[in-house]
Amino acid sequence: MLISNVGINPAAYLNNHSVENSSQTASQSVSAKDILNSIGISSSKVSDLGLSPTLSAPAPGVLTQTPGTITSFLKASIQNTDMNQDLNALANNVTTKANEVVQTQLREQQAEVGKFFDISGMSSSAVALLAAANTLMLTLNQADSKLSGKLSLVSFDAAKTTASSMMREGMNALSGSISQSALQLGITGVGAKLEYKGLQNERGALKHNAAKIDKLTTESHSIKNVLNGQNSVKLGAEGVDSLKSLNMKKTGTDATKNLNDATLKSNAGTSATESLGIKNSNKQISPEHQAILSKRLESVESDIRLEQNTMDMTRIDARKMQMTGDLIMKNSVTVGGIAGASRQYAATQERSEQQISQVNNRVASTASDEARESSRKSTSLIQEMLKTMESINQSKASALAAIAGNIRA
């Protein structure tokens, strides 16, 4: 039940505070004019009663006669029976109609199950504006959060790409080093083998052919000495032909010796020592022997030349093999470097991809930080707007409480 105080202008109160329906789909408001018309009081009559909600501007100054005039008017109005009856009738009708409207609204609210009570009309327009701004900032906050999450994923993907690229770079560098070392070692081994084989061949030539050449050279010198010795044969000492006899000593009872199947005859008139006569050596070589020696000398010299040519060819081949092996060993570093350069090129490409991934990671991380900062600022602004809305609602509630207190008074 509503309590009405005749000291309050009912028309002004009901005109400023209308009752609205809580339904969002079919809202209905009742003004003071409708209530007064329903009880038979027109606008002109309300104006005559001084109950018009229109307020006039206050006087520029309060006169000393004003309080007395107001007091006199109130006393006269209280003593006026017709006015008291009209005011009582108006208060009763307003109370009745207001109770009916409230009961109707309550019944409609109870009938509408699942619908919320609409309090949008109870707030000021500033609150509605702040609510719209709050919704906008909330949308921006959600967009910043989603953007920050996606940028974080991009940064994480870039980090994973960088890590995998670093692994591939390491594998390329390792495989390049292994292939370069293996190829270089293999080529060096081939060159060393060729050089060693050349040394062995040269050693064999010096060992076999040189020995044969020395032997044949010695024989050739001997034959030449025989042929060029002016038809003389030297048996290791000069003046051998001056020896004419060889004395033999007598030993034991047997004083005879058999030399070259020649019997030594004893001479009774000589001493005990017997002598053997020696003829002069033949200093001339027969033409047959000279021809044989000359032929042999030619054969020996031919063999010497053949062995020398064979040794020279063998040594040339050996030197060629040594030079080939040495060249292969010297070029093994170059060939190994070429083989490892391909892997180094792949590793360089991986490093370039790493740099690109690192740049993407930094850009995504920076953008994600900026998005998070924007989201944080949006959240702070939303909180500030909520505080402002709460302050406005508190001010509105205080005003409504003051009005309700005035009504109860």
Swiss-Prot record:
InterPro entries: BipC/SctB (IPR005427). Keywords: Host membrane, Membrane, Secreted, Transmembrane, Transmembrane helix, Virulence. One of its GO terms (cellular component) is membrane. It is found in: Secreted; Host membrane. Residues 350-368 have a biased composition (Polar residues). It is a single-pass membrane protein. The keyword Secreted applies. The core secretion machinery of the T3SS is composed of approximately 20 different proteins, including cytoplasmic components, a base, an export apparatus and a needle. This subunit is involved in the formation of a pore, called the translocon, in host membrane. Component of the type III secretion system 1 (SPI-1 T3SS), also called injectisome, which is used to inject bacterial effector proteins into eukaryotic host cells. SipB/SctE1 and SipC/SctB1 are inserted into the host membrane where they form a pore and allow the translocation of effector proteins into the cytosol of target cells. Belongs to the SctB/SipC family. This is SPI-1 type 3 secretion system translocon protein SctB. The lineage of its organism: Bacteria, Pseudomonadati, Pseudomonadota, Gammaproteobacteria, Enterobacterales. The gene is sctB1.
